[in-house]
Amino acid sequence: MEIRDEAEGEFIYAARNANAEGIKFNAETGAIVLKLPFPKESGLDGKEFNPTAMTVAPNGDIFLADGYASDHIFKFDKTGKYLKFFGERGNELKQFNTAHGMCLDTHYDPPRLLICDRSKGRLLHYSLDGEFIAEVITGLGMPTSAAVQGDYVSVPDLQGGVVILGKDNKIVTVLGHSPDPARGAAFNIPQDQWKEGIFSGTHGSYWDKEGNLYVQDWNVSGRIMKLVRVSANAAK
């Protein structure tokens, strides 16, 4: 999911895997202004199409990850015209095994796609033209998504907490990880057993302009937690 301020207002770009499409809708009214179903122009069979992530380039080009099916990344222009696809399912260096999350990494000029290869516990960089650049980090649990703010990247992990990476792509800290491994990737934890500040399986996150972090926990009852940023001095 991505939130963007555009000339016509504020819009949310989001993948809907159950509906087999990506959408763009007005953040205030909820009106859908663009739908991106499977692009038949790609020449692929499209028997399965279950997109999981969506992000937008500075020029408005749209990227849609088919993370629950082919693991292709589809590229469209800002009007929804199909342009190309890249990436594929597999276990080689340049392949994905559940391209579950994706965002624009603005630490670089030009920006890069930062893609979560969930089942292989790593993040990858691709260019906006679909060319493989590098592995960013390996050895994570099950990274589900990524969000960039300033020098930091938040990476929710389905096995527990939220990994925070610095500008050098190294781990700064892990937030809310449960010491009990039985509570990682645990969907059915009842609400009366929730622990404040501890996650059971983070699935999404987003920063606000003050650097506070909103984290969505993968839970049968639904759970969103706000983590308030503190200064380095206040943390001492």
Regions found by a protein language model. Give the residues of each.
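Beta-rich, blade/repeat-based domains predominating
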Residues: 1-10, 41-61, 91-112, 120-121, ...
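Residue position within the beta-strands of beta-propeller blades
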Residues: 14, 64-65, 115, 155, ...
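Surface-exposed loop and turn segments in beta-propeller and other repeat-based domains
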Residues: 33-49, 81-97, 173-197
